[in-house]
């Protein structure tokens, strides 16, 4: 039993050391005719808030990805943090700021444009940014 406990501890220690960050990928389906309007709401309201959290050091990076050609998930954003706990803290702070600054009519408008969304949470196993530690 003692050996099993040590193996479990070792397994989690190896996985924790292998993790190089935490990624949240939010994907949204927006009707083609409303893409530009949805992108503008992000540009005007959401992107500046997530960018602030990067500048404040709460998150490592924030990216918004869009396309008009490919699959139906055409408005996507990604947040990278150092770990899951940091993500939860940044997510809470980000949405607190979003809900306090985005006018309700703009929030409702974005929700009307969003046909469906999904969130994926990943442990970042490898990331290279070219910076020397």
Give, region by region, the residue ranges found by the protein language model.
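Sec-dependent N-terminal signal peptides
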Residues: 3-15
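Boundary of Sec targeting at the N-terminus
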Residues: 17-19
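N-terminal targeting signals for Sec/Tat export/insertion, comprising classic cleavable signal peptides
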Residues: 24-58, 63
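Short hydrophobic/aromatic beta-strand micro-patches
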Residues: 29, 78-80
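An amphipathic, aromatic/His-enriched active-site/gating alpha helix that lines ligand/cofactor pockets
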Residues: 45-48, 52-60, 80-125
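Short, solvent-exposed mixed-charge patches
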Residues: 132-133
């Amino acid at each position: 039993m003692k050996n099993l406990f040590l193996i479990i501890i070792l397994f989690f220690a190896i996985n924790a050391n292998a993790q190089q960050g935490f990624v949240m990928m939010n994907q949204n389906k927006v009707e083609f005719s409303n893409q530009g309007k949805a992108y503008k709401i992000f540009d005007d309201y959401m992107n500046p808030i997530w960018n602030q959290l990067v500048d404040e050091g709460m998150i490592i990076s924030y990216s918004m990805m869009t396309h008009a050609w490919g699959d139906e998930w055409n408005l996507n954003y990604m947040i990278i943090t150092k770990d899951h706990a940091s993500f939860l803290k940044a997510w809470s702070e980000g949405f607190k700021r979003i809900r306090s600054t985005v006018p309700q009519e703009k929030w409702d408008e974005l929700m009307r444009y969003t046909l469906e969304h999904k969130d994926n949470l990943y442990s970042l196993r490898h990331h290279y940014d070219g910076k020397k530690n």
